[in-house]
Amino acid sequence: MYLSDGQDLKQIVGRVIARQRSNAGITQEKLAEVAGLERGYISLIERGLRMPTVDTIFRLCRGLNVLPSKVMLEIEKQVEKEA
């Protein structure tokens, strides 16, 4: 699994997090509250402007009530799909 020249991992991660949040039916504000993060930072992640740390991914997953491994697998699949 390698990123092609046109791929931006931040954008893929952001789309996956945004999709998971949408699937959970919660707002950025609610996710921020539950995950202990700022809503603006979640917005930056979802727009592909910031790359979350592993700690942040775990916090987001806790707030989304999904396993981090599920999110990472979805990211991996999206990278492969776009390669």
Question: Where are the model-predicted features located?
Answer:
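Recognition helix of helix-turn-helix/homeodomain-like DNA-binding domains
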Residues: G36-R50
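Conserved hydrophobic/aromatic packing and binding residues within compact polymer-binding modules
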Residues: I17, L31-A32, I42-I45, V71
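Short, charged recognition helix plus adjacent turn
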Residues: Y2, K70-A83
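Short basic helix-loop element that most often maps to the first helix and adjoining turn
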Residues: R15-V34
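A detector for short, charged/polar N-terminal pre-domain segments
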Residues: M1-I12
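Helix-turn-helix DNA-binding elements, focusing on the entry/boundary residues of the two helices
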Residues: I17, Q28, R39, V54-I57
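DNA major-groove recognition helix of helix-turn-helix/homeodomain DNA-binding modules
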Residues: D55-K70
